[in-house]
Swiss-Prot record:
An annotated GO BP: glutamyl-tRNA aminoacylation
Residue interval(s) of motif 'KMSKS' region: 244-248
Subunit organization: Monomer.
GO molecular function terms attached to this record: ATP binding; glutamate-tRNA ligase activity; tRNA binding; zinc ion binding
Native source species: Maricaulis maris (strain MCS10)
EC number(s) reported in the record: 6.1.1.17
Keywords for the protein's UniProt record, in alphabetical order: Aminoacyl-tRNA synthetase, ATP-binding, Cytoplasm, Ligase, Nucleotide-binding, Protein biosynthesis
Protein name: Glutamate--tRNA ligase 2
Gene3D superfamilies xref list: 1.10.10.350, HUPs (3.40.50.620)
One cellular component (GO) term of this entry: cytosol
Highest rank taxon of the organism: Bacteria
Reactions catalysed, as given in the entry: tRNA(Glu) + L-glutamate + ATP = L-glutamyl-tRNA(Glu) + AMP + diphosphate
Main location: cytoplasm
């Protein structure tokens, strides 16, 4: 049976459990995606838990940022998000049950004694073991502060991981894990196990930086006689240079990719392929991804962030998106364009006319806005630098005047008619097409990125085309 199903055939329940200390990091977004896909593939549940036990670092604004990031990415969760902090009483209850079962003990070591023990253990090449694991608590004074520690195992610890295979640690590698601090608050590894058990999580997919934690947590599962979940520890994302992912590699929050103009489906597709494979297939719709995803496809080697590939994949999804949706999504990005028309209805009309072409020429919404600029430029278009050079001499401007007359006489105004008209005019003038195309493009676009000239004129219409040409039939613009 596939390892992802080996959990007594229970309904698959996965979870994403971020700490609310910042935005939805790109690595966390991938973890959430993998868990979401696994649950959706098998008709299970994808749950959300906020691990907010570190009150000093937990930030309500970060919680909102994480929820917003997941929502924007289209990763819907089942039920209400669970607050780990609010479950502290339950964590304490299990710590005392472990104490009663003989799997935990009260440790009365002071901070100074603990540090000394830690130094001695390090020098001996083993993890810390508290002397109180073999002493009776009655030996301590009644008012002495204590922690509750889990008794580290005396034999090797072994887990079966769906990605890493069998992982084994020698007993000496594990210390007597603190379950409850001296102030009575639970620690991470205890809280995680209790929450995952109570939430009936069957599969834990997370970064391999938690692999050692899985070794620790598996001991608590066994001590409580709880069934272990299926573990799947995925290698972390690296930069293109193979080094740990950082901001210079693209280690940003999901909202940063949104603000750069990536589509959620494009980012989902890219993150899916960042550490998971399904043959040679690279492009996935959501339905394709849900149908294909399994733990067997997760790679054991670290994936490398590749912004060029992200742009390629996002460009594909941009081209597949509906024109109406893109017209709406690109609107905020138009604010960066200078000297553009402000008529909203005219802007929308031109965008809708051109969108089937423009969306095949851009990788992001930001690029789509740049590709749209020629449509929206305010007349008269100011020509500067290279854009002005094709219109520097009188002969060119006189030819532009004749072209103005030629185009004005056209009966039909569509791509085919305009393309034929330009060719006929070049033949009549006995010049190469470049002698016509370059100055015409300068007059119509001002040097902004634009498709074929016949399409440009079709998109902006007869009146705007002739007006833009007329604006440049004046003494040559200087730099």
């Amino acid at each position: 049976m596939n390892s992802q199903l080996q959990n007594n055939d229970k309904m698959i329940r996965t979870r994403f459990a971020p700490s609310p200390t910042g935005f939805l990091h790109i690595g966390g977004a991938r973890t959430a995606l993998f868990n979401w896909l696994l649950a959706r593939r098998h008709g299970g549940a994808f749950l959300l838990r906020i691990e907010d036990t570190d009150r000093a670092r937990s930030n309500p604004a970060a919680v909102e940022a994480i929820l917003d990031g997941l929502s924007w990415m289209g990763l819907d969760w089942d039920g209400e998000p669970v607050s780990q902090f609010e479950r502290a009483d339950r964590h304490v209850e299990i710590a005392h049950e472990l104490l009663a079962r003989g799997h935990a003990f009260k440790c009365y070591c002071t901070a100074e004694e603990t540090q000394l023990l830690r130094d001695e253990a390090f020098a001996a090449g083993r993890a810390l073991r508290s002397p109180w694991r073999d002493r009776d608590a009655s030996e301590a004074r009644a008012d002495t502060p204590f922690t509750i520690r889990f008794k580290a195992p005396d034999s090797d610890v072994v887990i079966e991981d769906a990605v890493q295979g069998q992982v084994r640690w020698a007993a000496k590698e594990f210390d007597d894990l603190i379950l409850l601090r001296s102030d009575g608050t639970p620690t991470y590894n205890l809280a995680v196990v209790v929450d995952d058990h109570d939430m009936e999580i069957t599969h834990i997919v997370r970064g391999d930086d938690h692999l050692v934690n899985a070794g620790r947590q598996s001991q608590i599962y066994d001590a409580m006689e709880w069934q272990r979940p299926v573990f799947a520890h995925v290698p972390l994302i690296h930069g293109q240079d193979g080094k740990k992912l950082s901001k210079r590699h693209g280690a940003l929050g999901a909202e940063a990719y949104r603000d750069m103009g990536y589509l959620p489906e494009g980012l989902r597709n890219y993150l899916l392929r960042l550490g998971w494979s399904h043959g040679d297939q690279e492009l996935f719709s959501d339905a394709d991804a849900v149908a294909a995803f399994d733990l067997a496809g997760l790679n054991k080697a670290p994936a490398r962030m590749d912004l060029d590939k992200l742009n390629h994949i996002n460009g594909y999804h941009l081209a597949q998106a509906s024109d109406d949706r893109l017209c709406e999504l690109v609107t905020p990005f138009l604010d960066s364009l200078e000297n553009r028309i402000e008529d909203i209805n005219l802007t929308t009309a031109r965008l809708k006319a051109a969108m089937p072409t423009l969306k095949t020429r851009a990788a992001t919404l930001e690029e789509l806005a740049d590709q749209s600029y020629f449509l929206l430029r305010q007349r008269p278009i100011q020509l500067e630098g290279k854009a002005a050079k094709p219109l520097k001499d009188d002969e060119t401007r006189q030819r532009l005047y004749r072209l103005f007359t030629h185009l004005g006489d056209l009966k039909a105004w569509n791509e085919a008619a305009l393309s034929d008209a330009l060719k006929q005019f070049a033949e009549a003038e006995s010049v190469g097409f470049g002698k016509i195309g370059q100055p015409l493009r300068a007059a119509l676009t001002g040097g902004a990125p634009a498709p074929d000239l016949a399409l440009v004129m079709t998109f902006i219409g007869r009146d705007e085309t002739l007006d833009r040409i007329k604006d440049q039939m004046t003494p040559a613009t200087t730099e």
